[in-house]
């Protein structure tokens, strides 16, 4: 789903952007833009790290080379809280239709929100994740340089600290 383009059909129930399936993309039937701001390839790199099959140059493989991908090109020019929530709902719905579990990587480069899960967008996203089993959402960390947007915790010499903890009963980790 490209949330930025208008020359096509928006996915139901949304009223903006265009939706192209893999066959349309392979056949070159999806509209595109030459706008550098919309096509700077960050998503391509992230998708490669996540799911590259290793068939391209240098045979680099992603962490989940057999994964199916559902991609959304975000619209950052309008209400980001709406477009990110719509994107997450869209991806989970498509994965549900395919009968697949789903992990969403939200490396969108923004640091909006309350950072404590109390804002409405965070609550909506949490509700989408917990609506059914087999859903997870991860966010990029560390791209902010010296800006104060990092997860942090002061650890004393006498204190035990766990950054990641594996839930043995669920096969997942959290921090």
Model-derived features with residue positions:
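Subtilisin-like serine protease catalytic core
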Residues: 1-82, 99, 132
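Substrate-binding/access-modulating region of protease and related hydrolase catalytic domains
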Residues: 74-174
């Amino acid at each position: 789903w490209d949330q930025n383009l208008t020359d096509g059909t928006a996915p139901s129930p949304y009223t903006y952007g265009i939706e192209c399936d893999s066959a349309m993309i392979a056949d070159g039937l999806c509209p595109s833009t030459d706008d550098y701001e919309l096509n700077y390839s960050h998503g391509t790199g992230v998708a490669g790290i996540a799911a590259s099959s290793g068939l391209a140059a240098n045979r680099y493989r992603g962490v989940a080379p057999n994964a199916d991908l559902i991609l959304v090109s975000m619209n950052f020019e309008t209400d980001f809280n709406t477009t990110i929530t719509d994107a997450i709902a869209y991806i989970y719905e498509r994965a549900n239709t395919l009968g697949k579990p789903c992990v969403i990587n939200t490396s969108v480069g923004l640091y909006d929100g309350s950072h404590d899960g109390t804002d409405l967008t965070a609550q909506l996203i949490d509700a989408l994740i917990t609506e059914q089993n087999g859903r997870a959402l991860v966010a990029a960390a560390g791209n902010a340089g010296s800006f104060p947007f990092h997860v942090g915790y002061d650890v004393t010499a006498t204190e035990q600290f766990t950054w990641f903890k594996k839930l043995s009963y669920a096969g997942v980790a959290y921090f």
